[in-house]
Amino acid sequence: MLKVQNPGITGAFLFFGEIIMKIITWNVNGLRACMEKGWKEFFLQADADLFGIQETKLQPDQISLDLPGYHIYYNSAEKKGYSGTAVFAKKEPESVRYGIGIDQHDHEGRVITLEYPDFYYVNCYTPNAQNELKRLAYRMQWENDFRQYLKSLNMAKPVILSGDLNVAHEEIDLKNPKENRNNAGFSDEEREKMTELLRSGFTDVYRFLYPEKTDAYTWWSYRFRARERNAGWRIDYFIISDDLKSSVSDCTILSDVTGSDHCPVMLEIF
């Protein structure tokens, strides 16, 4: 069981006598733009204990957020207006790491790790392989190094990973698998790297709970009325250490929440 050290966490609630911790992940596709579409209202209503976002596309001095009760951590890309992650945490962590400790990967603001007494929370924005798989070779190196990073954390304590991992793992995870075979996000190579991760002591929470659920997507192209037609991809995940599977209460895709081309995903765990 995942032990929540502070029973007074605001927003955590009792579930058959256990404290439920709520974690949300959302690729906001530009935090400032998303704020104009209701991000803060959703954030306050969600009342999550941990809230990880990806593609912030800003430097911390470009935004001022008044979020009482939250500690805020940014990891911004050196290239302005690109990539970036942030975590909003009700409980101050024991430590915070930015990046994965490998220089070639740590200039784009892709990973933030918060350490708590009983687990690590990792917020990640995985590099896109890009059109014609131009960045696939780099993506493969990233996958290998990031997997080793997660495995090293997992040796110390359980891991909760969330974020836009930029891959639809199986055919059930996107609307049009045949048409997208070997496109970025659905190449054989990227899918195999996800398989390798899940064979390394980790679990895709949504598929663990809902192995046969179809039409469950987290990203839709802005083109061709894709969201209206639900022609999407499931590329935003919660991945947890296998040891935490028995602690999961639910994992929910909040597809009705707009403001980005992605929607939030919520994990409830005790």
Task: Write out the residue ranges for each language-model feature.
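Structured beta-strand-rich core segments of catalytic domains in phosphoester-bond hydrolases
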Residues: 57, 62-129
